[in-house]
Amino acid sequence: MSRHRFNNVQIKALPGGLMAHHEPDADGGQPGSQKLPMWPSERIPPGGAGAFHSAKVQYSKETADLIRLLVKESKMSMLVRKQIDESLRNGEPLPLPEPPRPNTNNDPDKETLAILDRARNAKRKNLRQIEASGAYKQSYYRPPADNRMHGEKAKSQLQFTMAGTHLPDPAIKPRRRPREEQLVTEEDLINELLDQINERAEWLTEMESMGQGKKYRPEIRDQIAERLRRIQALESKMKMKSNGGFRFVD
């Protein structure tokens, strides 16, 4: 089996314009190289199914220029600017602003109260503002042109497949790629703890809006304070590693 892991059935089932073809050498001899079949979809990126990938949008030139001008005038980091520019080029939604990182140098109990105050005082749009922004207006969907096979060609291909003409060899089994183990770093653990803190602060704000905040407030405060202490321990561990220090435990 070839290293490209394409059998005859998969290559023959592709449309005519996507078939792998050989290019003759300059001296007119045997074909030199074999081109791989192109990705058959223009809307769905390689490496995933359409159900898990949102449809791409085409930003107008005026919208893209306005967003780039606002980014240029604002005080954003280079990482956020690159993310916004990549979203404009790929037609993806703009990245959401991240909540402020808690100050682990302060007392965990005081920092917990500050986090809950920020979540409680966050401004939210009411129904009238959401309707005025046009969020509930439905736009007419026009499916884009694709490169699928024509009806007669697809029928004939289905007939050949059902007749068993292009069935694959059962002795040939595709190779499975070995799973790559992802190493979890201290920064990943800190980001996960920050997400848990923000989720609990927002949930407590919703409970307070329904009049149930007093019932869950002590428990949520303890959970947020405990996660802040874990973040402090992870940050001190990262600082010790960066300084080249080691700690021995009996």
Swiss-Prot record:
Coiled coil regions, renumbered to chain: none
Domain of life: Eukaryota
Region (Disordered), start-end ranges: 86-110
Listed Pfam families: UPF0193 (PF05250)
UniProt family annotation: Belongs to the UPF0193 (EVG1) family.
Protein name in UniProt: UPF0193 protein EVG1 homolog
Native species: Drosophila melanogaster
